[in-house]
Amino acid sequence: MKNTKYCREDGYSGEMRKMDDKKLKVCLVGLSGGHLTHLYMLKPFWKNKERFWVTFDKEDARSLLQGEKLYPLYFPSNRSIKALIINTWRALKILPKEKPDLIISTGAAGAVSFFWLGKLFGAKTIYIEVFDRIDAPTIAGKLCYPVTDRFIVEWDEMKEVYPKSINLGSIF
């Protein structure tokens, strides 16, 4: 398992630096726990941008994102048609109101509605497949892949799973 690090010392990748050149409104979608931690580690990119977060209304998320604009996802969301419908409805209310230029997600089910609807509203999308997936796709990754502008993986083996992906190495 080869994990090549392509990120620069300042935490920016070349792809994200290109997007940094203009003032962006960013939507960060990730479930609480590891997905949210993964997104938070991109702080060098999002810290000076107008942004809002979409995650579970749980203690770890509230603590980490204290002072941030936060929209709650319906919980539990994995493999639940009910949750997909509720979170799609929430995305339909949030996206036209916030009008993000860019949606970034580290996955899980909550990302699906925001990516598909985000594209309809003109947002660019970046999906980061989670670090612990080395050679097999996640369900959310498979569902978001067709509408993702930049699909980022953290292992060379994942390039076989997602041929159009970019391996930027570990975010950790």
Task: Please report, for each region that a protein language model flagged, where it lies by residue.
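Active-site-proximal region of nucleotide-activated glycan assembly enzymes
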Residues: A123-F172
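An aromatic- and histidine-rich active-site surface loop
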Residues: L102-F121
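Helix N-cap/beta->alpha junction signal
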Residues: S32, G107, E154-D156
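Conserved nucleotide-sugar phosphate-binding/catalytic loop shared by glycosyltransferases and other
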Residues: G30, N48-N87, E157, L168-I171
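Structural motif
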Residues: K25, D101-L102
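An amphipathic, basic-hydrophobic alpha-helix
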Residues: R79-D101, L120
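N-terminal subdomain of nucleotide-sugar transferases
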Residues: K2-Y6, G11-F56, L65
